[in-house]
């Protein structure tokens, strides 16, 4: 909770470092379960044995600028550039992940932002963290309820119902989507809407779009 409250005081370029820290503090048991499942599958484990893993490709994401509009790679580039995040500095400053699976999971955080369409707003970060570490688990819902609904009720009680609807939609929208096993590194030039279709993702609801847009760090 300390790191979450500090996020709103950080400069935008420094927030990835804080988010990486939060990712190490939640969902340890579920993280191990997901990791074991990933490594026990020959197809997904092989993704870590490549010369150009997802982490290697993401470390040079500025090359994605040349990709066609609407592709996963171009969407990643535009998202990472939106607040001029220094990706290399954020990773180096954090220093908490090891090579292999852990590095891939670090990059999956940004992939979730892009594929699910969540911004870097307070709500967007909460929804991304919840989706990442408690997919299909009610504890993830409880997390974004705490950081989103409770605070919003204190600031603007009339918006509580909309916030609740958005949180419910986040939970329903991510449940059962096996994004951990999807080879994003092989589909950087594919249209992002096709990827969403392949993952059987529902469209963002109006409630999610509204709350994500209006949920500021101030």
Give names to the regions the model predicted.
Residues 1-10, 20, 28:
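N-terminal mature-domain "stem" immediately C-terminal to a signal peptide or N-terminal signal-anchor/transmembrane
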Residues 14-24, 31-190:
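Core of folded catalytic or high-affinity ligand/protein-binding domains
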Residues 173-218:
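A cross-kingdom marker for long, charged
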